[in-house]
Regions:
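Acidic catalytic patch
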Residues: 37, 60-87
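Short active-site oxyanion
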Residues: 30-32, 70, 104-108
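Acidic, PIN/NYN-like endoribonuclease modules and their adjacent C-terminal/linker elements
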Residues: 1, 99-123
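Short, well-structured N-terminal submotif of metal-dependent ribonuclease cores
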Residues: 1-35, 50-60, 114
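A general alpha-helix detector
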Residues: 9, 42-46, 61-64, 81
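Alpha-helix capping/helix-boundary segments
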Residues: 8, 39, 78, 98, ...
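Residues that scaffold the ATP/ADP-binding catalytic core of kinase and kinase-like folds
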Residues: 11-13, 46, 119
Length: 123
């Protein structure tokens, strides 16, 4: 299994530099790839803040990517839930990941962030 960094994923998704897109596609499509949540967070940040990609488009692009059989992440269900929160709520992606863990894996999350606390499941 190979790990890719944010630059590989960005070139693959954006297809803004043909030569790098082709090389990224060869890596992503040609072997088993693991994408850590830290890399996903960087991809989300760059797409939103530097490229101005709408949140829903980010969600759809990453869902398409992680739906590939050869792509693994820390926890697909948590990431999918995080992407839903990120696309619908005015929260940053790391908070969306915390909500994913809270809603999917029932992990208790502690925060001083009032907005985040309103979205947490409490048992």
């Amino acid at each position: 299994m190979q790990i890719v960094d944010a630059n590989i994923i960005l070139r693959y998704l954006l297809n803004d530099q043909a030569d790098l897109h082709q090389r990224a596609a060869g890596i992503i499509e040609g072997q088993d790839v693991w994408i850590p949540f830290e890399v996903v967070a960087e991809v989300v940040y760059v797409l939103e803040k530097l490229y101005g990609v709408p949140r829903n488009a980010i969600k759809m692009s990453l869902q398409m990517l992680i739906s590939c059989e050869n792509i693994s992440v820390n926890d697909k269900a948590v990431l999918e839930k995080a992407l839903q929160f990120f696309s619908k709520k005015n929260i940053d992606f790391v908070d969306a990941l915390l909500l994913g863990y809270n809603h999917v894996r029932k992990h208790e999350v502690f925060s001083f962030d009032k907005g985040l606390n309103k979205l947490l499941l409490v048992e």
